[in-house]
């Protein structure tokens, strides 16, 4: 960056974590000249906490990131060392692909993809301040005095925003262990009028795997046939490993209870609220003290790394207490502690300050993604980063933003939850958060989102070809199975028990029966044997859900109609007779743009919605496709 021209970009992304990498890549793929600002290049893609990607709900997000040509799925496929499909025995809608990852492989693979991305420049340095021209972002000032000009900024600070690490009675500023926090940006955000809060997360101690008694432990293997995250991955080639399973003991619990006053969580040192679904071991003992033990997964951090991550004992107890705890856990009696567990507090912004494009309402061109929005988890961060980066590029180019609806993607569910409801604790994704789980499956993420990625210009030619090849194969298989039919009487000859109503049923219809798969149908129609395994699985799942999907479409249509009914920007909520003063205040503060958004405002009632619709009609509001106007007219 030797010339003045090199200091001007369309989009600047601050932070090289999971949100930052996806944001920078998406902005660059969208054609924006993009800068990724990070303290050090070698920390790009670091897995700060657990060495794993995916899981229940989270695996859906990774598949959606991949369907939009993001990075996380491909990187996880390269670095994954223990692939497991969670909820395999349940329906496809709630299955969760997951892998443990080699930390080093993951980081290096992510850095390689960032380096190879066109339109993307990595700028080493700390972001000290944001530069504005009126109420519009115009640049970033670095700690060394350099000023980078831009049309949009994506802020992905993770736990670095006023980060504070706690280990027992000790506490010190840090973004994560061994790295400095970002101290200046919080003041700038406060000056913009944003509402900031404090959240907390934690991590367990790291252990020397050579000092663990693996022989005494139960071991968990990877799936025999690993299921990749990415459409671009033909098969997993990285060696797969086992992890160990152990449990805390009553003696463990006694030590924790005796030292609760020394835990940062229970001594009053920590202000922030921690994640409900990833509690510290202190929380587990206090809240579930009647249990004899709590499960711990001992996850190796790499193929050539002896470090082990004990998943299940996140803690902020003093180091000496952590050592005592280890001695009471089977298999860990002689384990050497390489790094103590710790809690970390950090600033976040109330995500209700955001539009669904992830642009802030107060500052034009400023986008937020990841833990700064109150979420927890790599996958949640990466998904937000991709959407924020794409929309930052579109903002810089003067284009309308891309809004993902709740009916389209788990990303849409998450963003809508954040921007309409806010957070009282770190938010993580679950399949139960989605109203239309049957539609939003991990296996159909490509069908749902890849055409959109192509439409907005962030899809590579290689992925386009692969997607079209797969869709063509599925379409042909669907056509063939729908063209073949059989009577109930003849089906009985092949031991298929159908209702004897005389109605012919197609092979496609038969696949909806729980005890019928393609293998059984090949006995009737041998030509079906030519369908390849990937297409076969997709066809079976599609046919299985076809009837239920038809029923769900009416519910989806209702929600889509509500999304289309726009609330005019000039509507005076105070003038709506019959609304309580409390609701008027909430609506003025929240500024919902559609009836669907208004329905998700706390305290809104069906009667209040009816009053609001009547006022819109009186005002002269009219229905238009949300895709044509939402976030792009009054929100622009």
From Swiss-Prot:
Extract the GO molecular function terms from the UniProt entry.
Answer: flavin adenine dinucleotide binding
The UniProt entry, under InterPro entries, shows: FAD/NAD-bd_sf, GIDA_C_N, MnmG, MnmG-rel, MnmG-rel_CS, MnmG_C, MnmG_C_subdom, MnmG_C_subdom_sf
GO process terms (BP) = tRNA methylation; tRNA wobble uridine modification
Chain residues that bind NAD(+): 274-288
Where located? Answer: Cytoplasm
What does this protein need as cofactor?
FAD
Description of how the protein assembles with itself and partners: Homodimer. Heterotetramer of two MnmE and two MnmG subunits.
In terms of HAMAP family, this protein maps to: MnmG_GidA
Q: What role is this protein assigned?
A: NAD-binding protein involved in the addition of a carboxymethylaminomethyl (cmnm) group at the wobble position (U34) of certain tRNAs, forming tRNA-cmnm(5)s(2)U34.
What protein name does the entry list? tRNA uridine 5-carboxymethylaminomethyl modification enzyme MnmG
Species source reads: Brucella melitensis biotype 1 (strain ATCC 23456 / CCUG 17765 / NCTC 10094 / 16M)
Q: What is the lineage of its organism?
A: Bacteria, Pseudomonadati, Pseudomonadota, Alphaproteobacteria, Hyphomicrobiales
